Amino acid sequence: MQRHRFYAPPAQITNASITLGNDESHHLARVLRLLPGAVVFAFDGEGNEYECEVAQINKTKTELNVIAQLSDEVESPLQLTLGQALIKSDKFDWVVQKATELGVTRIVPLITEHSEFRKADGREQRLQRWRRIALEATKQCGRRKLPEISDVQNFQQFCEQQTAGQRLIFSERGGSGIASLATAATISIAIGPEGGWSKAEIDLANAQGYIALSLGNRILRTETAALAALALVQYQLGDLP
């Protein structure tokens, strides 16, 4: 049986009821054509999810009655930050979607020496699109926490801000194998653009304490590398069976 999931931020939730906003209400009533009495699920993006019954539907909002709060754990125990160099729009969209499904905590779009970045692009529009993609992926995969999609940063800013836990840079030019990764609960992963990292960027990462890791002898597309790196780190640290 399909589970219909809806997003309601904490401000829309009380102990006994949940109010869905306009977009979620439209999807519930006009797309799914659910009626009062239907059982649905609502999550707050911060780790909580509730089984609910549809109580009332009107043009701009839907009222849900809370039946029970779910207690099973679905989130990753790891705090995973993915610094992904900017690439073509559709490929970056795909990385956001799949990284969300895998359980990433935060995604940081990076400007690097070889990244595809045009200042004329609407930065705010891109951020809003990536956040919508992350929300839809969160609904689909059963997560309860929305990943943070940060504003665009340059690579130096990213390196200087990531100070906790393991800091990893995946490079096509050498690096240790994933088996050398030490246990940690907080991990930052840097993935370069299609043109690769420059020598200056590798030197910067090394100076900031980043460990260079390899994804093997074959050259991967950057979007493939991002997902492979996340999955391997999760497997190595016990997040994947």
Model-derived segments and spans:
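RNA substrate-binding interface of SAM-dependent RNA methyltransferases
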Residues: 73-167
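Generic structural signal for residues in well-ordered beta-strands
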Residues: 64, 146-150, 212
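N-terminal positively charged helical leader segments and presequences
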Residues: 1-72
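Structured adenosyl-cofactor binding patch, chiefly the S-adenosyl-L-methionine
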Residues: 199-241
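Short, ordered loop/turn segments at secondary-structure junctions
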Residues: 11, 69, 111-115, 217-218
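Glycine/charged-rich beta-loop-alpha catalytic/anionic-binding loops adjacent to active sites
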Residues: 18-20, 77-81, 185-188, 207-215
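Active-site/ligand-binding-proximal alpha/beta "capping" segment
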Residues: 162-202, 210-213
